[in-house]
Amino acid sequence: MTTNYKVTELFCIIDEFCKHFDAENTGNLLEDNSGVKRRRRAASLSDSEIMTILLYFHFGTFRNFKHYYLFFIKGTMKSYFPKAVSYNRFVELESRVFFQLMFFLNLGAFGRCTGITFVDSTMIPVCHNLRRYANKVFKGIATDGKGTMGWCHGFKLHLACNDRGEIIAFVLIGANVSDKDTNVFKVLAKRLYGKLFADKGYISQKLFDFLFEDGIQLVTGLRVNMKNKLMPFYDRMMLRKRYIIETINDMLKNTAQIVHSRHRSVSNFIMNLISVLGAYCFFDNKSKALQGYCIEDTKQLSLF
């Protein structure tokens, strides 16, 4: 379990962002011309407190959000959140901070492209394969797809990270969408430049040409049945550093619990997903590829 200092750190960063976010939006939002009166009543918990509670859940050892909220937030951390509402009310308030949390990820939490980017996809199952026909929450939304670990009913998460282990961008698609789909990279590669290192599942001449037009060089390994070709020594070494993106996927699933089958609505599934990505940005044990940009500093030459 993390220390109470982490709660204070998270809240201060998020609250400062929410103040700037609200100041920018004041008077700039579109008016509601539907004629329906809205009270615009403030909740007992502020938006920054709701976001802090959502993110802090993924730092601890709790496997169940309900127990975390009832016994930890309303119990141990009662002095930090004296106006905590009931659990049912908090679940209703989660979706209120969706836009604030998305803006916070893109403007205040995610890293920036350094010219060295790693990309990978991971399956996000929503239920067991045998229960996919009985699942009603994601009926018509989740799809069946096959990955390296077998068949999956759910979604596929594409992640792009830099050499410091910081997430740059993400895309959530159906599980049956190919990794080589250019529509995925129309969103994923908006902020990228330089070299993009990927596994063999991204080998596609169409995708390579699409990225090259935007100034991005796709670097992948070679399949067994492909002709051998010369590759710069630096690119070969950086392909070995793809463990960074694999480590991120492992931390998201095993530490931050991005995958579980207890979702009762699509909106809560989305809130859990972006909360996990936001919490990872504040993890202290991120993997790094390079201490500098010199290959000798990584001591990879000793492998030969």
For the regions a protein language model found, what residue spans apply to each?
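Short alpha-helical elements
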Residues: 1-304
